[in-house]
């Protein structure tokens, strides 16, 4: 699918090993006769292959956009799997494993995968049904969505990982707004386009960081290097740059390009020492030289 040229074999080894790692999952869940276990934990049959292990919080940023470029037929099969999981289990996947909704990780990043596939022209006959599933998953009465819709952010005392959820929901909502516009759903376009700007409500212009709010005020004793319950496997350094859908808006919040570049330089030049809890799984990756984008 991808050929690179290099006079150094080690460069080729690194690249192709990384490419191989990127396609270890999702995994085929269909048997040779078309039977598969879906998100209602019952056995179904489909002539189109179905898949499992959609760890979408890990893969929505880069992996699925890569698939949409080099594995277009397989992406259409992923969309068909999403449709079946929606029909059988009642919602689009967030972090699906072997037909189970694991309840793991945040956001509703299946909407990002679907939107990217749609605008990259992945052939699929039922985008409108997936769009209905997008609206449903973005309006559930749990995981901080009600206060997010009411206040324009998630208060830290009402939901864990409030800053990360606010930021990722805003990105997801931008994706939905683009689908709404493409499908001529004006009312939902206006609603979700407004929600996509909610990231601004957790930006503290005095510090230049995305911070938690408690009862409408900035939470006290804030440190951007602290790993705590307000962020998902990260601290404020990583999440303060997570506005992939509105980089120009983020730059404006910082007061322009010069001040934004200054903040980026702070990110890469600050100490990698973290404060707070030791984050399981990726503690070594949480340093200020890395950011969620």
Short names for language-model regions:
Residues 1-50, 84, 91-94, 124, ...:
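Acidic/polar, glycine-enriched structural segments that form the non-catalytic walls/loops
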Residues 4-7, 47-52, 97-103, 160-163, ...:
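A short glycine/serine-rich beta->alpha loop
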Residues 35-39, 43, 127-161, 209-244, ...:
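Extended glycan-interaction surfaces of carbohydrate-active proteins
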Residues 24-30, 87-93, 142-143, 200-209, ...:
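Secretory-pathway/luminal and periplasmic proteins that interact with or process carbohydrate-rich
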Residues 291-292:
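Conserved small/polar residues in nucleotide/adenosyl-binding loops
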Residues 74-78, 125-127, 187-191, 203-211, ...:
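Acidic/polar loop patches that form or flank catalytic/metal-binding clefts of enzymes
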Residues 16-20, 131-137, 141, 178-205:
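Acidic, mature catalytic/reactive cores of soluble proteins
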Residues 52-180, 193, 239-252:
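Aromatic-rich carbohydrate-recognition surfaces in CAZymes
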């Amino acid at each position: 699918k991808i050929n690179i040229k290099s006079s150094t074999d080690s460069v080729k080894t690194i690249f192709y090993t990384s490419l191989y790692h990127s396609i270890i999952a999702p995994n085929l869940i269909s048997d040779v006769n078309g039977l598969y276990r879906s998100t209602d934990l019952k056995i179904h049959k489909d002539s189109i292959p179905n898949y499992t292990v959609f760890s979408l919080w890990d893969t929505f940023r880069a992996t699925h956009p890569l698939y949409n470029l080099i594995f277009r037929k397989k992406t259409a099969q992923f969309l068909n799997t999403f449709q079946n999981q929606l029909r059988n289990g009642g919602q689009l996947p967030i972090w699906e494993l072997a037909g189970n909704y694991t309840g793991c990780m945040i956001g509703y990043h299946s909407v990002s995968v679907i939107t990217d596939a749609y605008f990259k022209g992945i052939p699929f006959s039922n985008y409108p049904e997936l769009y209905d599933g997008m609206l449903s998953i973005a309006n559930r009465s749990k995981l901080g969505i009600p206060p997010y819709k009411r206040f324009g952010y998630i208060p830290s005392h009402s939901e864990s990982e409030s800053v990360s959820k606010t930021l990722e929901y805003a990105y997801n909502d931008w994706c939905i707004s683009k689908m709404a516009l493409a499908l001529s759903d004006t009312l939902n376009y206006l609603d979700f386009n407004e929600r996509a700007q909610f990231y601004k409500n957790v930006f503290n212009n005095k510090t230049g960081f995305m911070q938690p709010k408690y009862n409408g005020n900035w939470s006290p004793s804030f440190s951007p290097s602290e790993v705590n319950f307000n962020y998902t496997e990260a601290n404020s350094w990583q999440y303060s740059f997570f506005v992939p859908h509105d980089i120009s808006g983020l730059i404006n919040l910082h007061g322009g390009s010069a001040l934004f570049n200054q903040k980026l330089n702070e990110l890469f030049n600050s100490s990698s020492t973290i404060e707070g809890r030791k984050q399981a799984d990726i503690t070594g990756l949480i340093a200020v030289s890395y950011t969620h984008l």
